[in-house]
Amino acid sequence: MGVRDSHGEAAGTPDPVEKGIATLNTIRIGVKAMVHKDGALRKAEILSIKQRKDGLAFYVHYVDFNKRLDEWVASSRLDLSQEVEWPQPEKPEKKKSGPAKAPSKNKRVRAGSRDVSATPDTLTGKNTNVGKAQRPSKAGGKENRGDETPADLSMLASEAVSADGTPKAVSEDIDMMDASFTDAKEIKEEERALGLMSREEEIEKLRTSGSMTQNPTEVHRVRNLDRLQMGKYDIEPWYFSPYPASFSDAEVVYIDEFCLSYFDNKRAFERHRTKCTLTHPPGNEIYRDDNISFFEVDGRRQRTWCRNLCLLSKLFLDHKTLYYDVDPFLFYCMCTRDETGCHLVGYFSKEKESGEGYNLACILTLPQYQRRGYGRLLISFSYELSKREGKVGSPEKPLSDLGLLGYRQYWRETLVEILLDSGRETVSENELAMLTSMTEKDVHETLVTFKMLRYNKGQWIIVLTDEVIEERNKRLEKEKIKGSRKIDPARLQWKPPVFTASSRTWNW
């Protein structure tokens, strides 16, 4: 039997790319053209087109570049003197031949048109009360998720947002999982495959493959917000996040830095600020030192706040899957303090009970606080919690590209410090895992990645190369000059929480 692709068709040579000269009247979504970027011409794919007062504008993705560089460009930046690549025409679906499969008599037919409960108004971010949210009806839960696909694929927001701007109850869960970095071709292949899957298979694929959204349409690849104002910072979002569709027309989206409610109107935001009394994340403060504090927030007790946090973080995290159930997660939020309150710097989420032994599900440092060492603090804090639990842990796999770099740096620095301990002559990978609360697999992969594991005279030995030692010395010199932030385990006031069965499961 010959090689076949995912659709069952024989795999052969790829279809030839159709090229030709385009004009502003003939150019369309999916075309790849040369665009002026930073003084150079770069190939870019057109993802969306809209009419502005000053003419046509094109939302482009630069081929082989990170999606955070996607942007709207004026027509003058397109070089139409060169040939463009036209998108491949869609192939007609082949009808499957053969007798229809009779339904099983043992399976009970499930009603496909049960009413779905409306989502509470608090989800819109307006008039939000960060208190104990109402328990959503289970009518929007897992048992009601059929195989149907939204018919209107031209919506600017995702299927998680209804026409009135309120996230639908069908997606009552937000779960943001790290996934591997994939290039544009892989994403397209995955998105094409998603169209042939059932809802359950699609969700499972999203959790493991790194696809950005459930709906395989081009509109979801377009960043929908232009600018955020959060506290004293103006922030440019990187990626799409399913905020209400009306927010895409706002010049600035205002986010309350304490309760994380969101507004597309400055006056409404200012009125909210006069009434909002929250000055820190709505949870228990479990760590405090001279610089930062950590708050533990239960997704079940503070659903609205945690959902708002996940919506915000989706703007800066690619290849994430969003659901609207935060009940099975704890959120550990890192803040800086001043006279006005505790300002959110970053967070990581953690499953209340992970069958795979993960100690972290999703991690983010907000852009305005990046490159200051806060990411390493978040990673370090997650392992301090694992040490307090007496367990080894690992971040949810696979990691994003930036997440993998951050973790590898932390793993290497942690292992090198232990290996350079003068009072330790021999050590095994298992002992390193117990000392650091890292898994043996993470220990082994770190040693292999940085060429610290060698085979000599019939046994494996750990070797610290000159390069590794030199990098450590440079880091220590830099820390002497600039200082360094570290987690002090003695300041951690925390015991591993114990949950009932209902509080650590999906709210379906």
From Swiss-Prot:
One Gene Ontology term from the biological process aspect of the record: regulation of secondary metabolite biosynthetic process
Residue positions of the active site: 396 (proton donor/acceptor)
Domain Tudor-knot: 27-80
CDD domains: NAT_SF
Chain residues that bind acetyl-CoA: 361-365, 370-376, 400
Residue ranges covered by zinc fingers (C2HC MYST-type): 253-278
Domain of life of the source: Eukaryota
Region (Disordered): 84-150
A GO term, aspect molecular function: histone crotonyltransferase activity
Sequence positions bearing N6-acetyllysine: 320
Keywords noted in UniProt: Acetylation, Activator, Chromatin regulator, Chromosome, DNA damage, DNA repair, Nucleus, Transcription, Transcription regulation, Transferase
PTM remark: Autoacetylation at Lys-320 is required for proper function.
Annotated domain remarks: The ESA1-RPD3 motif is common to ESA1 and RPD3 and is required for ESA1 histone acetyl-transferase (HAT) activity and RPD3 histone deacetylase (HDAC) activity.
Protein family (similarity comment): Belongs to the MYST (SAS/MOZ) family.
Name of protein: Histone acetyltransferase esa1
